[in-house]
Each structure stands twice: as C-alpha cells, then as structure tokens.
Amino acid sequence: MSLVEISGSDAMAAPMPGRVPPPPPRPPPMPRRLPPMFDAFDHTGAGMVWGFPRPAKKRASLKPLHWVKITSDLQGSLWDELQRRHGDSQTAIELDISELETLFFVEAKPEKIRLHDLRRASYRVFNVINLSMPLPDMMTAVLAMDESVVDVDQIEKLIKFCPTNEEMELLKTYTGDKAALGKYEQYLLELMKVPRLEAKLRVFSFKTQFGTKITELKERLNVVTSACEENLLLIHQVRSSEKLKEIMKKIPCLGNTSNQGPDRGKTFLSPVEFKLDRLSVKRMHYFCKLKEIMKKIPCLGNTSKSNPRVGVKLDSSVSDTHTVKSMHYYCKVLASEASELLDVYKDLQSLESASKIQVKSLAQNIQAIIKRLEKLKQELTASETDGPASEVFCNVCWFFVRLMI
C-alpha cells in the first residue's frame, strides 16, 4: 500500500489503520442558576418595567399594595443600577402565603338582604344621605317639632319618602336577621319607630308655616275689608249715577231689536225688565270693561264717521265673543246718540278697587287651614295613646294649640 500524505486537521481526524475511532466528547452541562429577582426588562424610552417572579396563586383576597409607575429617566437611579446588575444571580424573596393571608386578608362583606325595588331604594337612600344629620337624630327633632333643627324643606322631603303601607307590611312580616337587611330597609325600619310618621310630619309642617300663613291671611282680610268699604261706596255711586241709569234704560232697545223674529216668541222688554246675562260674563267684570270701553268711545265714534285715522281695534279678551261684540256695538251707538253719557265712569270711582275682591280664593285658604287644624286634632288624639313614643310630640302639640287660642 502506498503512503498518502495527510496534513492539518485531516491527519488528526483520520483513523489509524486497524483501530476503532473514540466516541465524541459529551456536551458541556447547562448552567445551573436560580431565577433572578428581575428577569425581564422592557425598555420603553425613558422608563423601563421589570417583571417580578410570578407569585404562587393566591388562595384568598389580600389587601392590594398600591404603587405608582415611574415614567421619568431612570439613569443613575437605584433601578438603573439593578438593571445593570441583571446578569448577577438574584434570589427571589420567599414569602409565607399563609402568613400574608392572615395579616392582610380582606374579609368578604356579607351580602345585604333587599326586600324592595333596588332603583327606588337607591334613589331614596341617596336623598336621605344628603340630609343634614343622622336619621335617628332627625326623628328626635321631628317628634319635638324643633324648627331650629329641621326646616320645612327637610320636612317635605321626609314626607315624600315616608314608607308606604306595602313597604311597612313587608318589613313587619320579615322574620330573618334585621341587621342583615340593606340600607333602604334599615332606613325604613328607623322611620317605622315613629307611630304614624307621615301624619306627625304634616302636623310639623303646618306648625312651621302657621305663622306665615296667618300673617298673609290677615293682610288679605284687611284688603277685603277695605275693598268691601269701597264696594259699599260703589253701590252708592251706582244708585246715585243718573248717567248710568240712562245707559241701562237704553239697553233694552238693542235687545228688543236683536230679538225680533217669528220664531223667538214675545221677548220684548220694558226698560226695567232685564238682567245683564248677555252683556256681562261677571257683573264686576262687565262694569270694568264698560269703564275701559267708555274711554275708547270717541275713537269708536270717529270710526263710525268714516275717519280711519283715529280708529281703534276692538278688545276681544272676554271669553264670550258675542258679548264683546254686543257691548262694543252698544257703546258705538251711545257715542252717536248720547255722547253726554260717555263719561259715566267718572261716577264710578270705586269700581276698580271693588273689582279686585277675591272672596273665593280667600275662603279656600281659610278652609285649608281649618282642615289642617282638624288633622292636627286627630293626630293629637291618636298620639295620646302611643305612650312614651309620642309623649314629647303631644306636649309640643298642646303648647302650640294654646298659642293659637
């Protein structure tokens, strides 16, 4: 066999004739290192985020540790140094989860029992929370009818949010733990401690506003008294006005002319046989309108004489259109036939004051006060049988009644 010259690495790799080649060397072992404390970096411009080792799955809710992420330049900071040392082996802190759960366990709140509609309950509880004091203290002030503590607006709000009969019945039939009930149910239970709360609140509201109502009523009564004196004077003026008598005497002429016809029957009247049913919506209103129209008569008269420059648009504010037309036409006739009667309103100087009397409205206000006094009497009678729960309320009521008398 001829020898072949082999050089370099090939000479080392070539097996010697007649020998088995040695096995290849084992690969080097993988480096063994513990998981680092900071094992991930996220470079985001000026700041960076380092990921902590994922903790074991929590078995209970723990109180959170709140921190704020740093977004400014970290160069030269402690966090920058930790980043540069990232290649060093870092050992994660081993935490005792059981101890953490013992120290920082968040106790789950017991679920409240709701017996009523959640939307209605939330709205009412929100308004009650906005009251100026705790509800028990306010109920104490209500029973004492203390106006220095509870104002009329708060009273009206409490009246609005008084429990209904259905709500009270639902709570009365509940046999479970009342401490486990929701806020709205607790609110209702507090209100239900006061017997007939709504009736007492209405008495309290009446007491609060009584002084103002009586003052306003006295002022209106004085106006009525003065107006009645004016009314008596007006009656004298009406009876003594010769011009008004002449006007009234001429009205049947218009009516008899309008009532002519084969199917109307005998409707002719003498000057003293008619009432102002068509020429007035209300008697006082008629006289007031008559006064206004009389002042406009010259314009109406000029219009009838075809002088459009001084014409006037007729007033149509009265609900009865036919009445307005009849009245205006009659005034127009007076302007043409008896112009000396046009200043009749000068004989009725008390007309305007007397027309402002609102006896019906005044009577309604007086009647409303009488009804509320009757309600006060009923609640006072019922409260006297409540015992200690309404004792303070009864004492204040009796004191208020004595002041009114």
Swiss-Prot record:
Highest taxon listed in the record's lineage: Eukaryota
UniProt-listed InterPro entries: FH2_Formin, FH2_Formin_sf, Formin_homology_domain
SUPFAM superfamilies associated with the record: Formin homology 2 domain (FH2 domain) (SSF101447)
Disordered: annotated segments: 1-31
Transmembrane segment boundaries: none
Pro residues bias: start-end ranges: 18-31
Domain FH2: 52-405
Gene3D superfamilies associated with the record: Formin, FH2 domain
Listed Pfam families: FH2 (PF02181)
Family to which the UniProt record says this protein belongs: Belongs to the formin-like family. Class-II subfamily.
Protein name (database record): Formin-like protein 15a
Taxonomic source organism: Arabidopsis thaliana (Mouse-ear cress)
Gene name per UniProt: FH15A
